[in-house]
A protein has these predicted regions:
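Extracytosolic ligand-binding ectodomains
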Residues: 2-17, 24-391
Length: 391
């Protein structure tokens, strides 16, 4: 009799575990979110900045109970090295092996564009936090799985054209662009928006990644009469441009896209970087909102950042922080980690989220997958190796 009761107890316990085990596991398992970014090489600062913003937001949400009734968020980081082919492999790995609910993207437009077909095939939301290529979000897909809390080249080019002509009073720009899909995206936008101001570039020059000297391109722009160089480059090549400008003895002002802030630009150029002006979406200098103060405090406690002048690649952190919160809100609204449901929720987020960069009220729609526009950009300048707002 005792033996029978003992066996019956074991059977009942086993039955209970079988019946409730998967459900309990599903309820308590962390919700994984992926990051595909360059966390090594010349643009590693961008990847590190993005990772910091994501982790600060994740810790904040987890401290308040997580999502979906208590599930913690967990970040899975993969280094795409700015390599499109590796980015595609990573995209599949994050979704198929790691089973992430969404993926955040890094600095390189070339990588992001290569990954776009994968997100749509696997029905996984992508949230850009840096790469600005226009066609990342305007990709012609319906439904569209690519979203962004970052700059969009089309908006950036409009902003730069207006700043150059209205603020700097320059009417003879020369474009110096990297020879990639990102450079091509900006060539189209800059030509369009400067044209809208009644201005035509005196020359359009290209360079390849790792080119050691930009003197020939700069001399051609100088001889063409350029009174401003509009630069589209990441940190390694941007540094070569600034060094080459000094080499040819040309004191022309440089107005740049923000790629130069994603690496060791100031370290590689020293005082030569002073005065180079470029766009950002956020600055940790000046009076901060309560959320800005919180993020700075977390940067200090978690990463040893002593002040705004030590915040590396600040837009990476700011964009990623806001982007993570919007994705978490979408997961909560969808009541699911299913990619299609999260995507639908992103397009119809309820209420308002007061973020670091701005207050977001329905930041995405079926036709608009960029949460930020040119109304959200600011101009900054390199001074003494630090990024400070233009006065």
């Amino acid at each position: 009799m005792v033996y029978r009761r003992w066996m019956l107890s074991i059977a009942l316990v086993a039955l209970a575990l079988v019946a409730s085990g998967p459900g309990l596991h599903a309820q308590s398992a962390p919700v994984k979110l992926g990051l595909s970014a360059a966390v090594s090489g010349g643009s590693a600062a961008s990847g590190e900045a993005i990772k910091r913003g994501l982790l600060i937001a994740i810790d904040e949400i987890n401290a308040k109970g997580g999502v979906l009734g208590g599930r913690k968020l967990e970040l899975v980081v993969r280094d795409d090295e700015g390599n499109p082919a590796k980015g595609v492999v990573i995209a599949r790995e994050l979704v198929e092996r790691e089973q992430v609910a969404a993926v955040f993207g890094g600095l390189h437009t070339t990588v992001a564009l290569a990954q776009v077909p994968v997100w749509h095939e696997l029905k996984t939301p992508y949230m850009g936090t840096w790469a600005a290529g226009t066609n990342i979000t305007r990709n012609g897909q319906k439904p569209n799985y690519a979203f962004r809390v970052s700059a969009n080249d089309d908006y950036v080019d409009k902003f730069l054209a207006r700043y150059a002509t209205e603020r700097l009073k320059r009417g003879k720009p020369g474009f110096l662009l990297e020879n990639t899909a990102w450079g091509q995206s900006n060539e189209v936008g800059l030509t369009k928006w400067f044209g809208d101001q009644g201005v035509k570039a005196v020359g359009i020059e290209k360079f390849n990644w790792n080119d050691p000297d930009m003197s020939p391109q700069l001399l051609r722009l100088k001889n063409g009469g350029a009174d401003l160089v509009v630069l589209v480059a990441n940190a390694p090549e941007g540094a070569q441009v600034v060094k080459s400008r000094a080499k040819v003895g040309w004191a022309v002002p440089i107005l740049s896209h923000w790629g130069i802030s994603g690496g060791r630009f100031a370290e590689l150029t020293g005082d030569l970087s002073d005065g180079v002006t470029f766009i950002q979406t956020y600055s940790f200098f000046g009076q901060q909102s309560a959320r800005g103060q919180y993020v700075l405090k977390q940067l200090a406690e978690k990463f040893g950042v002593k002040g705004p002048e030590e915040v590396i690649a600040p837009v990476g952190t700011a964009n990623a922080y806001d982007a993570l919160h919007l994705v978490a809100l979408a997961i909560e609204q969808a009541k699911s980690t299913d990619g299609a449901k999260v995507r639908d929720a992103l397009e119809d987020l309820k209420g308002e989220y007061t973020g670091l960069i701005k207050a977001y009220r329905r930041p995405f729609t079926s036709d608009q997958h960029d949460a930020l526009t040119d109304q959200d950009y600011i101009m900054v300048v390199w001074r003494g190796g630090k990024i400070v707002p233009v006065q």
